[in-house]
Amino acid sequence: MAGRFRAFSFVDRILAHAPDATVRGRYTVPAHATRFPASLAAEAVGQLAAWAAMRSLDFRLRPVAGLAGETRFGRPFGPGDTLDLEATLESVTESDVAYSGRVLVGGGIALVLEHALGPMLPASEFDDPGALRADFATLTTTGAPPDRCDGVPPPDLAIDELDPGRRAKGTLSIPAEAPYFADHFPRKPVFPATLLMDALGTLAATAAGERVRVTGMRDVKVRVFMPPGETLDVTVDLADDEGVLTGRIVAKMQGKPAATARVLLERT
């Protein structure tokens, strides 16, 4: 697969991975990347935590997206920037991994992730455990080749209803084919939760109007796997919570909740 360990792999090197200490890694966004949204910094932290968790369980199990208590976006970054990654594993069991983390760019905080929880599932359902073990060895020694990712496309989001400043409703079309499906995951391709959050943040910012930016997410809960070619019904309802602009966002697949979250916005 041409995209394997390339199209959606955001750890170039693992610098420290002792189980009782902060896991550290590094990723440089390729200079040629067409689009690299802030949500992918959270993906990088999650991948770093996943590598450490998988290694501790001998690659028999792997975590998948589940819950994230809070994600805060800091200084902007983009193609050519190097992301210094940190993940603190609060617990690793055969049922789940609990972790927090952050991303630094040029010494400044680009992202903080708190209280994330990833359910553990058999690694062989999603990937070849032998390939994972070999790639971990690469990441902890020579490091992966640079410039692997070409970026990700903007979300295929159609707005059906818009009540500016209050509500938006639409559909998100998951592509039937995309390079990142070869990486996420080879044996069971699913739409990445961090790309879903990018799309839902875009929906919330559209509902809020001009001169608004997304500053974070709270209470993210991913309920189901979203396969290639699926269409999600997405809504956001905005509210002013003691001077803080927030949005309750819901994604449904085939009429049932697929993911929920609360988005934090700021007027610029």
Where are the language model's segments positioned?
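Short beta-strand/loop motifs in extracellular/secreted proteins, especially
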Residues: 99
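Non-catalytic linker/capping segments at the edges of enzyme domains
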Residues: 1-35, 60, 74-79, 90-96, ...
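Internal, hydrophobic beta-strand segments that form the core of beta-sheet-rich folds
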Residues: 102-104
